[in-house]
């Protein structure tokens, strides 16, 4: 029955029903098929969303929206340009490094992609870069937003599995750096092949000036992530602190945030949060039912039948998560599937924190791969490019993501180094 419900969910998504409603309809089918008392559905929905730490999600989203409306992005881009703009394919590297910094402020790959696609794709095209290549770099580097802290998917993973969010944020640092390095290597190969130019000469004086101008914006992620890792604040308090700091900066340092603008951004945040929370509510019902059906035990037994090899089991789990990420929103995949796979992973000796990074990396690849491809489609929509022409370049960046995934999967120290 569990596999029937998963098939129903995927079928509803395929015919174009929004994933939040698809999850709700699947929950309704669950009630009919399993003869469950209807009152359990609202109870489980409330239970799945009635967690204080989930308040961090709208606050991190709001922080990203506020950041996009200020001049923070310009200062971060200038810093990235001074750091890596002198390399062959300079603007592509600037794009990646900027996404690393922006990931520390938004926690969302889609938010990063929406902002960066409007900035980098036109400017890279003007310097002679192929526009689809510029879009591919922008889309794939935005994935850093779900690995580098603060990461909204990691918050959801922590809530779902009762894993320390602080530890998850620490675990994302080294894999995030490896992932960014892979993107830069891929960009450099394309730059040499296509003879893309450098962006600027390296000047220590320019770097010093860029650091000085970006110092205040960079204090936001340092205080937010540093306070959380240091144990001074909870994830919810850290996200609220970040919002307050961005509001102060936008109002008093670059005068870019009026009350009207703040209201518009708040409304946009409410819309995005509503989508995420509907997914969380619907996923909690389906996830609970699948757990009650003892699906984790069934999967563990199936893996034992297929192979005794640890390596092959881990490859199969990664393959399953990769395919799942192509069809499901990250929030739904985490809430529905992680409670099923985590007992299997722990039984194999995988640390829950390490597994959280593996899950997020897999779902990051899924955000770039059709049919869902939420990040890729965001960039294509903003630039007017077709998915096919962007994928011609993006596929090589996706390969570098899979290489990073394999490194992190089979070298646990990359995720557990700071724990």
Model segments located where?
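Alpha-helical transmembrane segments of multi-pass membrane transport proteins
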Residues: 1-419
């Amino acid at each position: 029955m569990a596999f029937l419900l998963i098939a129903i969910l995927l079928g509803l998504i395929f015919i174009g029903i929004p994933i939040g409603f698809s999850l709700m309809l699947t929950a309704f089918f669950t009630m009919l098929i399993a003869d469950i008392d209807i009152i359990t559905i609202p109870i489980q929905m409330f239970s799945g969303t009635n967690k204080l730490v989930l308040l961090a999600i709208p606050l991190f989203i709001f922080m990203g929206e506020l950041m996009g409306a200020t001049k923070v992005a310009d200062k971060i881009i200038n810093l990235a340009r001074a750091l890596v703009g002198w390399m062959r394919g300079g603007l592509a590297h600037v794009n990646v490094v900027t996404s690393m910094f922006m990931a520390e402020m938004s926690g969302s790959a889609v938010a990063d992609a929406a902002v960066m696609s409007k900035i980098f794709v036109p400017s890279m095209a003007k310097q002679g870069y192929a526009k689809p290549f510029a879009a591919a770099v922008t889309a794939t580097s935005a994935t850093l937003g779900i690995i580098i802290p603060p990461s909204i998917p990691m918050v959801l993973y922590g809530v779902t599995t009762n894993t320390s969010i602080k530890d998850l944020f620490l675990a994302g640092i080294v894999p995030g750096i490896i992932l960014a390095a892979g993107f830069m290597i891929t960009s450099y190969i394309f730059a040499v092949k296509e003879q893309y130019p450098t962006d600027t000469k390296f000047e220590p004086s320019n770097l010093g000036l860029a650091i000085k101008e970006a110092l205040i914006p960079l204090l936001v992620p340092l205080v937010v992530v540093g306070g959380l890792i240091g144990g001074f604040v909870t994830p919810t308090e850290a996200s609220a602190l970040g919002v307050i700091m961005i509001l102060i900066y936008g109002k008093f340092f670059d005068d870019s945030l009026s009350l009207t603008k703040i209201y518009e951004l708040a409304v946009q945040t409410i819309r995005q949060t509503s989508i995420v929370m509907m997914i969380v509510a619907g996923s909690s019902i389906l996830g609970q039912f699948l757990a009650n059906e003892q699906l984790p035990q069934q999967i563990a037994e199936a893996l034992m039948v297929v192979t005794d090899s640890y390596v092959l089991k881990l490859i199969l789990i990664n393959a399953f998560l990769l395919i799942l990420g192509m069809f499901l929103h990250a929030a739904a995949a985490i809430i529905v599937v992680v409670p099923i796979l985590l007992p299997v992973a722990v039984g194999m000796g995988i640390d829950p924190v390490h597994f959280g990074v593996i899950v997020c990396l897999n779902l990051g690849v899924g955000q770039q791969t059709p049919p869902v491809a939420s990040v890729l489609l965001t960039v294509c929509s903003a630039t007017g490019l077709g998915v096919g022409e962007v994928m011609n370049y993006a596929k090589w960046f996706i390969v570098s993501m899979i290489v990073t995934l394999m490194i992190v999967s089979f070298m646990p120290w990359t995720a557990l180094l700071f724990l």
